[in-house]
Structure formats: C-alpha cells, structure tokens
Amino acid sequence: MNICLLCEEGADNSALSALAQRWGLIHDATQTMALVLTPTHLELRKQDEPKLGGIYVDFVAGTMAHRRKFGGGRGEAVAKAVGIKKDYLPDVVDATAGLGRDAFVLASIGCNVRMVERHPVVAALLEDGLKRAYLDADIGEWMQQRMKLIYASSAQALTQISPTPDVVYLDPMYPHKTKSALVKKEMRVFQSLVGADEDADALLAPAMALAKKRVVVKRPDYAEPLNNQPAHASVTTKNHRFDIYPCI
C-alpha cells in the first residue's frame, strides 16, 4: 500500500523502515495520508487538514485510561451486550478492531479478546499501541494475556480462527451523523484511509456460525440492522445500539 511515511526528529528512522517492510507499506510523498513515527508513538495524519491532528492508539493514558478507571466497567453497554455476568467472562473475537477501544473495555473487565484488523495501516497503529501498553507497569501484564492482534480480513478470520470464541463482536464502519469533535476528527481521517465497510453485511452469517454463544453488532442508533436482519435483542445507549444475534 502507498502512503506517505514520515519520521520526526528524535524518532528511529530504521524502526520506520522496519515497520514499512512488516506491513507492506511503500513511501509515496504525493499521498495525502501520512503515517508518522514520533519519538513516542506512531500516528496517522491527513496532511491537507493539519488541524485534525494525529490519530494514534493509546491504552495507557488519555481517554482510554479514564474509561478504565472511571467508566462503567461491567455496567458498560458493550459489557452487557457480550453477556458478562458474575464469573462469566466470554472469550471474544472483535472482527473489526479499528482502534481497539471496545476490545480494551472488555479486556479491562477480564475478557480475552482477539482483535482482527485487515487494513495494514490500522493494524500498524493498533500494534504500536499494544506494544506500549504491554510495557506499562499498571496494565502491561494483563494486556499481554488478554489482548491479541490478528492481521487478517474479517471474512477470512471468521472461517479460520481457532479456538472458537464465545462471542463475535462486529463494529463495521458506518457514516456518522454526530458532530462530536472526536468522532468527526477520527471519522474524517479514517474514512479517508479505509472508506466504508461495504462488505460488512456479509460478515453476519459467518460470525453467527463461528460464535458459541452470540454475535454482537454495534450500530449507530439511526442505522438499519446489519444485513437488514432483525436482532434477537438489543442494548441501547444514547447514540448507539448493540444488536444481539444467537449463534447458529
């Protein structure tokens, strides 16, 4: 894949070269999207809109740290949707990992989560965030145990992954109406990079065939059900809906 590769002063240029080789990235200075190695992390920038800033994965500080420490924990909608109860902590495959936020919430509660990501740049960002989290004194030990990245297409993983998970979680890219600064920023950068998940409807059937317990699909509250298939049940929040489907 062609993308502009930049190394900031103080960062390791050889590390950027190794990263490009690992993920099959080819430097192209004409590309709008830039993958930038800073002295502290890897981030994605949309060069024609510098005010959007960089997008990167951070499980240690910022929003995710606050959510881990002060969020709803088992009371979060995603936790309810996957079926967490008392001593039951399902094994989860997040087949559309993205920045790994919901996967992190589930892992912080105690679930083992295998994250599947097919886009090389997004996978590189996610791996960078995981590596830094693995080294953290507070969360590193359980992060290494509970959060793993699989670089593969969702369709491929849903037919080949082993062992079989209790829950398959899907959060396909969908156009957002909200004007939230965070969502607007990330959606504009991400959609410029990966576009919409136009094959998302085709993931529901293999997900239902794979899961031992249930499939959970996160949707904006205004969106139709995935594949136009009515859900068995739903957990709703202010802006989203977690549709629940039984396994086949």
From Swiss-Prot:
It is found in: Cytoplasm. It holds the Pfam family SAM_MT. The keyword Methyltransferase applies. One of its GO terms (cellular component) is cytoplasm. Gene3D superfamilies: Vaccinia Virus protein VP39, YhiQ-like domain. S-adenosyl-L-methionine binds at residues 101-102, 117-118, 153-154, 171. Its EC number is 2.1.1.242. It comes from the Bacteria. InterPro entries: 16SrRNA_methylTrfase_J, SAM-dependent_MTases_sf. CDD domains: AdoMet_MTases. Keywords: Cytoplasm, Methyltransferase, rRNA processing, S-adenosyl-L-methionine, Transferase. It catalyses: guanosine(1516) in 16S rRNA + S-adenosyl-L-methionine = N(2)-methylguanosine(1516) in 16S rRNA + S-adenosyl-L-homocysteine + H(+). GO terms for molecular function: rRNA (guanine-N2-)-methyltransferase activity. Its main location: cytoplasm. NCBIfam families: PRK10742.1. HAMAP family: 16SrRNA_methyltr_J (MF_01523). PANTHER family: RIBOSOMAL RNA SMALL SUBUNIT METHYLTRANSFERASE J. Specifically methylates the guanosine in position 1516 of 16S rRNA. Belongs to the methyltransferase superfamily. RsmJ family. This is Ribosomal RNA small subunit methyltransferase J. It comes from Proteus mirabilis (strain HI4320). The lineage of its organism: Bacteria, Pseudomonadati, Pseudomonadota, Gammaproteobacteria, Enterobacterales.
